[in-house]
Amino acid sequence: MTIAARGGAALFCAGVADTEAEQAQGLMYRTDLQANEGLLFAPYPPGGEGLREASFWMKNTPTSLDIIFIRPDRTIARVAENTAPFSEAPIASGEPVSAVLEIRGGRAAELGIAEGDIVDWVQPDAAVEGAVEGG
């Protein structure tokens, strides 16, 4: 996936959490998150049942994260930077969103990722369908 940031294109290899169980787990217990690795919660909420404000926490998450909240038009609504490991304090999107990306804490600032930047990705099902139709 790519974020068109002010500092240039930022590329991430992100897993996809698209079920309720996967989204509840998130990056809990992960200690080895690489610089350009992340987890995309898409659709958010699972099943795509309408937009809603997102609220995350860092329970059981030993690594600081940047949590990027993404609008339906794929622009960034908010970047919650350097979240506190293990915190149970809610981290809110501030507005309804359709996807959320978690990356290693501090990366958004390093790469110049900010509100309004455009996020682009191919949903796994769409990539598979395109390969089947094209092949």
Place the predicted regions along the sequence by residue.
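Compact, glycine-rich, soluble single-domain proteins
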Residues: 1-135
